[in-house]
């Protein structure tokens, strides 16, 4: 494909998704004024979307109860580990390690815990490309699994105190290898970790100087690894006086973390990163203030900050609704969770990687850029191909067919309108434009050989056959197998579904 054509297609895709963000009927009350839509929004952002049963359950709750349910996940018994034990996985291999986490995201009853692990994985990044994976030898048959251990650290501390998280990640072997902390020696300090600690993890550009970085790097000297575990070597530590962010003393590495987190930019930086991950980009100062206040009054509790975020009116505003493009992981996991598909995730690491997100292997220290970067002509095609593979799965030993017939029977869906409205509610919050609805109804009523409209035509309501007389064939297996699968595909591949 010529570069100009490639770029034109990418722009067209991004424009279609942007248009979808504004496609709901603005003459009607905003979607987030309805409790059901609020809950669907909350479950997408604080998790990966929800099945019809879970959405019904949360709709019966008040907002406070729903947020409490998500935040206090430790009281929820989760049987994901027992499910994982039934699948043969060797987490020393990157593909199986990715499958292991994707399965946790798909089947966990604690979706916010997994979403927060994904947040920390993108902020406090480390990757297999440099950290490596365990390589047993006769001399060392059980080497430590640094990436898995870091991952479990994030899970244990997902909603903990920010200081505990930063202190822990500073000594984490995967992070030390990723940013060369183990080579930080007296007389020749390595500035990598000190720089990223301030720039990416805690303060942001403009809130520190190059001198602060150099002095902090001196404080981290003496840190190293021995047999894959953190060790402090006093003889390799610079014991001289350092001045960091205006404070002077004979500081060590842990002192640097505490000094940095006492800076007023630290709570604001974390508040902004949380807001942009869960709500929308470029928040106003008034959006961040409740989170900053929660940080200050609770000694840096991430749980308190998220409670402030998930109960903020701005989180349920028009600006927040469908304002983020789903990451590949959110897209894949969400579709599987919402349709109730049973899978061993064998093909999912390849799918998310081709879409631009290889878990445990971010592109660089800044993680994934996200936003519009998720959608190019190539990654859009991968999303469409995934949707097709998911809805046409026929029990291939890895992914079971979506239980579409069971859904129709359980919810007594026997008319074209009922079927379209059911899946529109499940996948698109019921925000199906009249043009899209008419196109979908016409598709259901057309013969089995009728072509599928394209996702973009679906949004525009331009598919041939729109407006035709609608008659539902008897709910024969062939109708479910062909037409209802196609309907699910069209909604999953639509520009609207790409938005979280």
Regions found by a protein language model. Give the residues of each.
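A general structural motif at alpha-helix termini
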Residues: 10, 59-62, 71, 169, ...
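Flexible, low-complexity segments enriched for small/polar residues
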Residues: 30-35, 39-52, 263, 267-298, ...
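Alpha-helix C-capping/helix-to-loop hinge sites
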Residues: 46, 104-105, 123, 127, ...
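Charged, compositionally biased N-terminal leader segments and the immediate start
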Residues: 6, 26-31
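Extracytoplasmic/secreted proteins, especially bacterial periplasmic and envelope-associated proteins
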Residues: 34, 38-42, 50, 54-57, ...
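N-terminal accessory alpha/beta regions
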Residues: 52-157, 182-183, 444, 450-468
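Active-site substrate-binding loop specific to GH73 endo-beta-N-acetylglucosaminidase modules
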Residues: 7, 17-23, 134-354
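N-terminal secretory signal peptides and thylakoid transit peptides that target proteins
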Residues: 1-14
């Amino acid at each position: 494909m010529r570069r100009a054509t490639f770029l034109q297609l990418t722009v067209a895709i991004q424009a279609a998704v942007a248009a979808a963000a504004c496609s709901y009927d603005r003459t009607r009350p905003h979607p987030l004024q309805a409790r059901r839509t609020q809950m669907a929004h909350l479950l997408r952002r604080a998790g990966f979307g929800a099945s019809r049963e879970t959405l019904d359950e949360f709709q019966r709750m008040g907002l406070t109860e729903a947020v409490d349910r998500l935040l206090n996940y430790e009281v929820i018994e989760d049987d994901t580990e027992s499910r994982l034990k039934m699948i043969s996985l060797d987490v020393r291999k990157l593909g199986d390690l990715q499958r292991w986490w994707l399965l946790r995201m798909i089947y966990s009853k604690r979706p916010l815990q997994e979403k927060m692990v994904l947040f920390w994985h993108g902020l406090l990044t480390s990757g297999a490309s440099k950290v490596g994976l365990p390589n047993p030898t006769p001399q060392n048959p059980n080497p430590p699994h640094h990436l898995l251990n870091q991952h479990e650290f994030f899970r244990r501390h997902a909603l903990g105190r920010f200081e505990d998280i930063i202190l822990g990640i500073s000594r984490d072997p995967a992070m030390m290898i990723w940013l060369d902390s183990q080579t930080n020696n007296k007389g020749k300090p390595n500035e990598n970790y000190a720089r990223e600690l301030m720039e990416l993890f805690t303060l942001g550009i403009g809130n520190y100087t190059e001198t602060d970085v150099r002095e902090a790097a001196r404080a981290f000297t003496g840190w190293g690894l021995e047999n894959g575990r953190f060790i402090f070597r006093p003889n390799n530590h610079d014991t001289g006086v350092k001045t960091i962010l205006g404070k002077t003393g004979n500081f060590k590495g842990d002192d640097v973390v505490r000094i940095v987190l006492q800076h007023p930019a630290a709570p604001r930086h974390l508040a902004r990163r949380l807001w942009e991950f869960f709500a929308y980009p470029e928040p106003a100062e008034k959006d961040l203030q409740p989170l900053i206040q929660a940080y200050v009054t609770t000694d840096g509790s991430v749980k308190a900050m998220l409670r402030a975020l998930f109960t903020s009116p701005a989180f349920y505003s028009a600006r927040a609704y469908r304002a983020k493009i789903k990451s590949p992981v959110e897209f894949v996991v969400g579709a599987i969770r919402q349709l109730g598909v049973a899978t061993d995730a064998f093909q999912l690491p390849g799918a998310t990687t081709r879409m631009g997100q290889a878990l445990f292997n971010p592109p660089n220290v800044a993680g994934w850029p996200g936003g519009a970067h998720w959608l190019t002509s190539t990654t859009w095609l991968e999303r469409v191909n995934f949707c097709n593979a998911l809805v046409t799965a026929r029990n291939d030993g890895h992914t079971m067919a979506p239980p579409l017939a069971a859904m129709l029977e359980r919810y007594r869906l026997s008319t074209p309108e009922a079927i379209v409205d059911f899946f529109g509610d499940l996948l698109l919050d019921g925000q199906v434009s009249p043009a899209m609805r008419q196109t979908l109804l016409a598709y259901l009523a057309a013969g089995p050989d009728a072509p599928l409209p394209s996702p973009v035509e679906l949004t525009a309501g331009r598919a041939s056959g729109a407006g035709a007389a609608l008659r539902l064939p008897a709910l024969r297996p062939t109708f479910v197998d062909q037409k209802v699968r196609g309907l699910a595909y069209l909604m999953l591949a639509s520009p609207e579904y790409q938005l979280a």
